[in-house]
Swiss-Prot record:
Membrane topology: Multi-pass membrane protein
Location in the cell: Cell inner membrane
Recorded GO CC terms: plasma membrane
Family of this protein: Belongs to the major facilitator superfamily. TsgA family.
GO MF terms held by the record: transmembrane transporter activity
UniProt entry keywords in alphabetical sequence: Cell inner membrane, Cell membrane, Membrane, Transmembrane, Transmembrane helix
Top-level lineage group: Bacteria
Organism for this UniProt entry: Edwardsiella ictaluri (strain 93-146)
Pfam families the UniProt entry points to: MFS_1 (PF07690)
Protein name per Swiss-Prot or TrEMBL: Protein TsgA homolog
Membrane-traversing stretches: 11-31, 51-71, 76-96, 101-121, 134-154, 160-180, 206-226, 246-266, 274-294, 297-317, 334-354, 363-383
InterPro entries in the cross-refs: MFS, MFS_dom, MFS_trans_sf, MFS_TsgA, MFS_TsgA-like
Length: 394
C-alpha cells in the first residue's frame, strides 16, 4: 500500500468518526426546533431519535459480516447516495414517519461508515501505533461535537430551518465520498482471492468477553453520567443553566485534550496496563465528583475525569483487535456493537433511576459501571493475547 493511499484511508476514518459525532451530539441542539416544526411536545420528539441510535446499532452489527461480502468502497459510495436521500427526505417530508425513517437511514449510514473507519485504522496500523492512531481518530468525534453545535446554534439564531444543520453535516460525507473515489481499499473474505495462503480463523478467547462488557459499561456509564450532570448540579447546588452546562463543556474539552495527549503517550505503554490505570483513576475522579459537597470543586473533578477517561474506549477497541494475530472486522465490530448498546440503554437504565431516586443516584450508578470497567481490565490482564501476538511491541 502506498503512503498516499494510506493517508487517504486514514482521513476517511477521521471523517467517519466526525460524521457520527456530529449526528449524535447535535441532536440536543435541534430537538426543540424539530418538536415545534411537527407541533409535538419535546418529550415525544426525543423518542423519535431512538431511530438514529437503532440505525447505528443495526448497521455496526450487520457490517461485521457485510464487510466480507460487499466491498468497502461500494458500501461508502452507496452510503453517500443514502445520505443525500435522507437529507432530501428531511427537507421535503412534513410527516413524522418520514422523519423517523430518515433518522434511521442516517443512523445506518453513520454506523456503516464508522465501522469501516475503525476497521481501516486497525488494519493499516499495527502494534502500539494502532492504539494511538485509533485514539486520534476518536478525537474527531469530540471535535465534531464541539464544532457542529456552534454551527447549529448560528444557523438557528439566524432563523434558518433546522434541516440545514443536517445538510452541513452531509458535507462530511461529501469529503468521505471524494476520498473514497480516489482510494484503494483492502479486500476481505471471499474478495481476497489473490492471497496464496488463506488466513486461518482464530478463536477470540475470553478476553474479548471482558473487553465487550467493559465497552458496554464504559459507554453506558459515561453517557449516564454526563446526561444527568446538569440536572444534578442544578438541584443539588442551585447552579444556573450556564454554570451546569459549563461542567459538561469542561468534560468534553478535557476529553478532547486527553485524546490528543494519549494518542502520543500510548506508544510508550503496554495497553492493558495503562487502560487498567486509567479506569481506576476515572472511577476515583467520578467518585470524588459524586461525593463532593463543594460546588467549587466540581469543575476540577470533571476536568480530571474527562482527561483520564478519554483513552479508555478506543484502547478497549484496540486491545480487542489485538486478541487475534490478524485484525478481525467481526471482532472489532462486536466490541463497537456492545458500546452502541450502551448508548441505547442510557435513558432506559438511568431514566427510571432518576424518576425513583433522583439524579444523584444515576451518577452513583455510572460510578459503579466505571468500577465494573476497572474490574474487567484487571481480569483481562490474566488472559489477554496482545503480548502473545507481538502487538505490544512499538
Amino acid at each position: 500500500m502506498t503512503d498516499s493511499n494510506r493517508i487517504r484511508l486514514t482521513w476517511i476514518s477521521f471523517f467517519s468518526y466526525a460524521l457520527t459525532g456530529a449526528l449524535v451530539i447535535v441532536t440536543g441542539m435541534v430537538m426543540g426546533n424539530i418538536a415545534e416544526y411537527f407541533n409535538l411536545p419535546i418529550s415525544s420528539m426525543s423518542n423519535t431519535f431512538t431511530f438514529l441510535n437503532t440505525g447505528i446499532l443495526v448497521s455496526i452489527f450487520l457490517n461485521a459480516w457485510l464487510m466480507e461480502i460487499i466491498p468497502l468502497k461500494r458500501q461508502l459510495v452507496f452510503g453517500f447516495i443514502l445520505m443525500i436521500l435522507a437529507i432530501a427526505g428531511l427537507m421535503v417530508g412534513h410527516n413524522l414517519a418520514i422523519f423517523s425513517a430518515c433518522m434511521f437511514v442516517l443512523g445506518v449510514v453513520s454506523g456503516i461508515t464508522m465501522s469501516i473507519g475503525t476497521f481501516l485504522i486497525t488494519h493499516i496500523y499495527t502494534g502500539r501505533q494502532r492504539g494511538s492512531r485509533l485514539l486520534f481518530t476518536d478525537s474527531f468525534f469530540s471535535m465534531a461535537g464541539m464544532v457542529f453545535p456552534i454551527i447549529a446554534a448560528t444557523l438557528l439564531a439566524q432563523h434558518v430551518a433546522w434541516y440545514w444543520v443536517y445538510a452541513c453535516i452531509g458535507v462530511l460525507y461529501l469529503a468521505i465520498f471524494i476520498l473514497t473515489l480516489c482510494s484503494d481499499f483492502p479486500q476481505l473474505g471471499k474478495q481476497a482471492v489473490g492471497d496464496s495462503q488463506p488466513v486461518r480463523k482464530e478463536k477470540w478467547g475470553i478476553g474479548v468477553l471482558f473487553l465487550s462488557i467493559a465497552a458496554l459499561c464504559y459507554i453506558l456509564g459515561q453517557l449516564g453520567f454526563i446526561q444527568w450532570v446538569p440536572e444534578y448540579a442544578a438541584k443539588r447546588f442551585g447552579m444556573s443553566i450556564e454554570e451546569s452546562g459549563g461542567l459538561v463543556s469542561n468534560f468534553w474539552t478535557a476529553y478532547m485534550v486527553g485524546m490528543w495527549f494519549f494518542s502520543v503517550a500510548l506508544r510508550f505503554f503496554d495497553l492493558q496496563r495503562i487502560v487498567t490505570v486509567l479506569a481506576a483513576l476515572s472511577t476515583f475522579m467520578m467518585y470524588m465528583f459524586v461525593s463532593s459537597q463543594q460546588s467549587a470543586m466540581l469543575s476540577m473533578y470533571i476536568l480530571g475525569l474527562g482527561f483520564v477517561s478519554s483513552a479508555i474506549y478506543t484502547t478497549l477497541i484496540t486491545l480487542g483487535s489485538q486478541q487475534t494475530k490478524v485484525s478481525s472486522p467481526k471482532l472489532v465490530n462486536f466490541i463497537l456493537t456492545c458500546g452502541t448498546i450502551g448508548t441505547m440503554l442510557t435513558f432506559v437504565v438511568t431514566g427510571p433511576i432518576v424518576a425513583h431516586s433522583g439524579a444523584h443516584a444515576a451518577l452513583a450508578t455510572a460510578n459503579g459501571l466505571y468500577l465494573v470497567v476497572f474490574v474487567m481490565c484487571v481480569l483481562l490482564g490474566f488472559v489477554t493475547k496482545h503480548r502473545l501476538h507481538g502487538h505490544a511491541a512499538k
